[in-house]
């Protein structure tokens, strides 16, 4: 009898991993190797199957959760998790993909002239940095120039147009321009990605950071130090942010209906005029990144463009849910879904959150994976290395030798106080 129960239990688990019932969660971003799952299960010996039974079978709900277990296991076997690679190794393919068109076509002086109205024009001549006098957002330019100045002695003569607005410029299908932007809608834009200025300065200004979010190195230390152990975190999904669009409304309304699952409130932004702008409630106060760390589950939404908060959330060592979106920054493609973070949408969010609340060790494992990735690969040194490789390769696409525009401002390092 015991043997029969054992065999039945193992078969039940295999069914859990391999059979996707019609009633299973309708999540349309399955792993690339989703159809090769038989290979995954064949690698499991009996002890591993037994272990998974004891850990997961008591929570198993075949109509809802079989997909999640499969995607987690598939993500664990993904060879592109950047666990042993250098930071440049993780991100090099993004640079190569962004520049493949320009390496083939070449960048002409006319390309730069066409691009100038859409960003800030920089020149590097004889290892000196020059810029047009006007910069729409000075602290954003400062955040970019910090890294350029650190690299100036390594870089050849070149010039580029860097977009410092929140939104990208180029549109797929239109004439291309070699413009660099911090984020893009990957399904719509062709902008060349660069690390956001906010790694150093010029991020959004809120009460806790009145001059703008910056110094990611210092924030990393502070956030990590403030994070309580996993088993001391509150088992609620937490969100605070302004209503940049109606896309976030459903989570706010869910929080009001089910505060045991979600604590989500809107804060005030510059566009706020009345409580109508925060769905009938007074705006919540803004909070620090460190405060987020009290909670086991954090959720990220894109704003006007990609979210500045995203990379900070991982540092809490909490499980990060990311709303499905085609908006990316340079490091997003290196994050593996269901290994570093969990992709969600409005229709599957409650099911996925409930799954992880009842499978705590899986939640803790993914939270740890995401934290380790950000802590290892998003250092200021890694950002500087990305800039270096990007500009060195970009310079190879230039089909002419830039000439200094004499009216431009020479940018020099700021004196340390």
Positions of predicted regions on the chain:
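N-terminal signal-anchor transmembrane helix specifying type II single-pass membrane topology
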Residues: 2-28
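Secretory-pathway glycan-assembly enzymes, especially type II membrane glycosyltransferases
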Residues: 23-288
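A positional/structural detector of protein chain ends, strongest at the extreme C-terminus
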Residues: 1-3, 416-417
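Generic structural signal for bulky hydrophobic/aromatic residues embedded
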Residues: 3-4, 9, 240, 254, ...
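Short, flexible loop/turn elements at secondary-structure junctions
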Residues: 3, 166-168, 234, 241-243, ...
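Catalytic binding pocket for nucleotide-activated donors in carbohydrate/polymer assembly enzymes
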Residues: 286-415
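Generic structural microfeature
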Residues: 11, 18-20, 157, 232, ...
């Amino acid at each position: 009898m015991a043997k029969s129960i054992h065999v039945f239990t193992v078969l039940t688990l295999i069914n859990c991993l391999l059979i996707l019932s019609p009633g299973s969660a309708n999540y349309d971003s399955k792993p690339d190797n989703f159809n090769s799952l038989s290979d995954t299960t064949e690698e499991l010996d009996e002890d591993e199957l037994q272990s998974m039974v004891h850990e997961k079978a008591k929570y198993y709900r075949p109509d809802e959760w079989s997909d999640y277990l499969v995607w987690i296991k598939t993500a664990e076997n993904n060879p592109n998790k950047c666990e042993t690679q250098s930071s440049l190794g993780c991100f090099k393919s993004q640079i190569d993909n962004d520049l493949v068109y320009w390496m083939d076509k070449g960048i002409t002086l006319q390309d730069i002239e066409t691009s100038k109205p859409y960003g800030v024009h920089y020149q590097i001549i004889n290892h000196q940095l020059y810029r047009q006098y006007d910069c729409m957002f000075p602290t954003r330019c400062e955040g970019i120039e910090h890294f350029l100045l650190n690299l100036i002695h390594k870089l050849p003569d070149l010039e580029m147009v860097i977009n410092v607005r929140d939104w990208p410029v180029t549109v797929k299908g239109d004439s291309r321009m070699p413009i660099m932007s911090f984020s893009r809608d990957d399904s719509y834009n062709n902008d060349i990605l660069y690390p956001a200025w906010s790694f150093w300065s010029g991020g959004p200004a809120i009460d806790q950071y009145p001059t703008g979010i910056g110094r990611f190195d210092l924030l990393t230390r502070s956030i990590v130090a403030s994070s309580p152990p996993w088993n001391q975190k509150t088992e609620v999904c937490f969100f605070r942010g302004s209503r940049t669009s109606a896309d976030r409304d459903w989570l706010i309304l869910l929080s009001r209906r089910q505060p045991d699952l979600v604590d989500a409130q809107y804060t005030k932004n510059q566009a706020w005029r009345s409580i109508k702008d925060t769905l009938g409630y007074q705006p919540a106060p803004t909070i620090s990144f460190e405060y987020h760390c009290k909670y086991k589950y954090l959720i990220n939404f894109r704003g006007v463009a990609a979210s500045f908060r995203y990379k900070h959330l991982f540092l809490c060592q909490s499980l990060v849910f990311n709303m499905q979106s085609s908006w990316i920054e340079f490091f997003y493609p290196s994050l593996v879904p269901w290994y570093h973070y969990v992709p969600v949408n409005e229709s599957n969010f409650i099911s996925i959150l409930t799954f992880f609340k009842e499978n705590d060790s899986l939640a803790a494992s993914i939270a740890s994976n995401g934290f380790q990735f950000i802590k290892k690969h998003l250092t200021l040194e890694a950002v500087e290395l990305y800039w270096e490789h990007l500009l060195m390769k970009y310079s190879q696409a230039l089909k002419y030798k830039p000439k200094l525009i004499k009216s431009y401002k020479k940018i020099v390092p700021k004196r340390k106080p």
